[in-house]
Amino acid sequence: MNSPRTAQEFIHWLEVGAGARWLRWAALAAVTVALSLRVAWTQFHGPTSEITLLQADTGRQVMRGEGFTTLVNFPQTAAVLEARRVKFDPGQAYPELHHAPLYPLTIAGALWLLPEGSREKWMSAAPVPPDGFGGDYILLGLNLVLLWTAALLTYRLGRRLFEPRVGALAAGALLLSVASWQATVAVNGTPLLMVLILAAFLVWQRLEELAGAELAGGRLAAWNAVLGGLVGLLFLAEYSAGTLVVVAFGYSALRFRGRERWLALAGVATAFALVTGPWIARNVALTGHPVALAGHNLALKAGDPTAEPTTMRTTLSATAPPVDLRKLANKTLTSLQEDLKSRMWAGGAMWLTAFFVAGWLYPFRAGPANRLRWVFTAALGVLLLAQAALNSGETERHAAVWLAPIVMVFGAGFFFVLLGSNALLGLWPRAAMAALLGLQALPLAHDALEPRRLHFQYPPYFPSLFQGMRLELQRREAIGRFGIMADVPAGVAWYGRERAWALPPRLRDFYAITLQQPIGELLLTPRTLDRPFFSELNARPILPGALSAVPNRFGEWGEIYAGLLTGALPREFPLAAPQKLAENLYVLLNPALPPVRGK
């Protein structure tokens, strides 16, 4: 029946025809949207890290036609570029040198699609608590769309490798996974990596279909080129994810023979080089390294005071950190241990992880599914190892989380194998599916029933304050002449739409920066003032005459922090007018700022 012409045909079309299928899809879409809105309403609290905010700011810069630049002035970036004879210019933003570009580019695309008037209104309006910043809601919408896309691709991969029930179970498990939702509402770009890895395995599934076909040489080369391009996009989304190219080369070398092998290898290599080449060339031109300053992550480890990545970025030095093999091994083993003991099980797949692991002992009857399971096992090992070694530990996009949809597909496949071998449960497949999805959904149900959160991450981010700091400089006609410095510079850049220097750990770097641009405002948030040493400083009775002993105990900034308590900042410190907004929130103004216009 092409289209119903009578009421009876229409009813039949709705009950058993194509209309019934459309109704089921519409109902599923409505439930998915309703679930998404509920979880987002209760769990969304804006970007939670400087890394995410930095990438959001870079995306906005790309959308504005400013290229891959950032409003965040890292002292390390300033030092590296100055060593290459690029001087600081208050009218020209620094290039972004610490992160892969694909998520910012995706953000730029989402911003560009919005009407300009609406976009500017959302990006400039000060939020009224508990509502959030308009730009944060745009990031949330983007990540929701990416998660829905990942769910559709999960269904498709499960259906093509096994059967529709497997795809439905895996997609449902993804949409009911609390870890997937935590990554989504954190707007850190994890769903983008899910989409890319799922697309890569759909291409691998297509290659399995072509592997035994006659006269498939040209199509094999084309599909391998698509695979190489997708792996290149993974590299541009997360540098360590680019190591999947090793698995792609290994698959092409082992799966094909003779001329087809060389065509497959050439397709992967050519496409990977074409996708990644321009970005690598840009990084080499700016810094001399293929991944720019992200290459330092090999030697850095979050939480290690001697190799803290934040300290490296905020230090005015162009010197690369030395690689200590003992520290590298310790970092790698610690991260792998955390992946295998915790993230693999709590990373989204949960119960299906157990079915996936148990399935290693069982060969699937379908050859392509069996081969791709081992391809994925190799990919899982390579990606976990690469992220553990090459990342500093700051990332929010853990491989164990964005690989979870494929774990779910193979776990669901083995689940139905077990179901079919059980005489009792095999009679009730839908009930068994519902029970498994119910267990998967329990943590998410708990989160969805919580009351609404504040829709921005305070502390330390307060969008209205950051916007007010920019307006203060505008009122004094000091934009560009004086800069802003903050311990959360990406927050100031994203919410305040103004360039901000990152607070250096050394006072001498602070004074060196003031020679390039006088600092008009310094923001100290709970990120700094709630640290244990400041709490200890706050608890001690401090006398003005005792300030000289403070720096030895509390670091170079100790005298400044002590001055916030006593009201007696050092005379040589240029930001001598502190404004106390809360016990752990200060804005220090420079008395040299011009007076407010009109006064």
Question: Where do the protein language model's features map onto the residues?
Answer:
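Perimembrane helix-loop-helix junctions
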Residues: 5, 9, 208-210, 243-273, ...
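Signature aromatic-anchored transmembrane alpha helix within multi-pass, membrane-resident enzymes
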Residues: 24-31, 165, 172, 220-229, ...
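Transmembrane alpha-helix segments characteristic
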Residues: 29, 169-170, 174, 226-231, ...
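Membrane-embedded, lumen/periplasm-facing catalytic core of multi-pass transferases
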Residues: 43, 430-491, 504, 526
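Transmembrane-helix signature of polytopic, membrane-embedded enzymes
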Residues: 118-133, 149-176, 194-195, 424-430, ...
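Multi-pass, polyprenyl lipid-linked donor-dependent membrane glycosyltransferases
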Residues: 138-149, 169-176, 180-207, 211, ...
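Hydrophobic, aromatic-rich transmembrane alpha-helices
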Residues: 154, 249, 253, 333-373, ...
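Hydrophobic/aromatic-rich transmembrane helices and adjacent perimembrane loops
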Residues: 183-184, 190-194, 234-237, 243, ...
